Amino acid sequence: MTRNFAKQILLIAAFFLIATASEAQYQWNSDSAYRAGAENTGRIWGYVFGDFYYKSKADSLNRGGNNQYTGIPKNRNAFAFRRLYLGYDFNFNKSFSSELLLAAEDNFPAGNPPSTATTGASGDLTSNGKETFFIKLANVRWKNIVKGTDLVVGEQVTPSFAALTEKVWNYRSVERTISDILRTPSYDMGAGLNGKYAKGNFGYNLLVANGSSDKPASTSFKWFYGDVWAMFLDKHLIVDVYADYQRLNWQTGYHHDRQMLKGFVAYSSSPITVGVEGFVNNIRADTKATKIGGGSDTIATKANGVAFFVHGDIVTNKLRFFARVDLYNPNSKVDNSKYTAYSGISSPNGYMTPGYKMTFSPSTGAAATATSTGDPTSKNTFFTAGLDFMPFKDIHFEPNVWYEHYASQLTSTGKQADADVVWRMTFFFVFGKHYSNTYTQL
């Protein structure tokens, strides 16, 4: 027994000796050392946000596509996570770094039509309905491969919004940016260049990727992303111009592709931030339009949207406010003098989604059936406003209202105006990394 005890002591001593020796060469978990760019340093980090919500009003036609609360009946309430992140960042040396990020999130929330109790959830869930982690980022960065430019290879953040626009909006815990709601990828598998010049006042991002986010590529068509940005007035005024392109189907007699143009302007400071983001997305040969006199045409889908937001301090480092309004038209090509109905042919996710007439189980409240209305033309008006209470740095409680209004563009049906209204107590916390501003969440 004495011999076994001695062996255990020796093993424990050996473990601590190895750990101490390793610590002398590597700092596996130091945010400050990692941010300083020190060799052989890394950090474990993560953040979480979710809500307690109550849906006081439900759109009778369950429009909104992949919106957070589409397909959830009136008077439903629940506690829910909307995102959990667990990441590790590592500096090999001053020239090379890497990142790995695992995510569990409601990318396509359970209950979104046409998902029902019989067809299964449409969210990022396992076959038995449990939320699970997936690989969201996994890449290596070669810093200053050309002076001022980094090369990034692997699953990485795209130039679309996550690197800049989302950070200025700040409140991803409340809602996605307007282009994110329409599922422009925030991450993708490919090779990219990130450039930054003039003391960080000007820059660009380019990326060639699969266009399938974390999923394996199913075609050879690539998604081409790019943006250029500039900061003025001591980096308070921010301007960003973004564009992307992807072929969707390409064969004799049918050329189907998408191309987005997006602009963003904001004034950002600690006391107050105001911004506007707008986009036009042209999706060629994407819509079947039924003629009044019979027959049909294949026409383009021309979607456009604009978002206005503001957030600022009430009590510095303790209490803030935020508000946002989005206006979205899924297709400005609607012509009631020529066509009676529209339907998507093979639209990219988030576009040309119709409403659904749904029934729910009287005993459980789960979705039972979902029947398409066949009308994807409804204009959306989104509004959110709330408060951000920070009892401690990196911990946030955010009471807010979430409102989405829908109105059809078809004269044959009338506007059929209705809305979703949700009241929420949102919580957010981050660990392992720290930001320069107390209110910063991203």
Regions found by a protein language model. Name each.
Residues 218-221, 255-256:
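Short glycine/proline-enriched turns and hinge-like loops at secondary-structure junctions
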Residues 7, 80, 184, 378-379:
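Short hydrophobic/aromatic segments of transmembrane alpha-helices and their interfaces
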Residues 27-29, 37, 55-60, 69-73, ...:
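Outer-membrane beta-barrel pore domains
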Residues 1-10:
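Bacterial N-terminal signal peptides that target proteins for export
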Residues 9-19:
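Bacterial N-terminal signal peptides
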Residues 31-57, 73-213, 220-239, 311-331:
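Outer membrane beta-barrel
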Residues 20-24:
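Sec/Tat signal peptide C-region and signal peptidase I cleavage site
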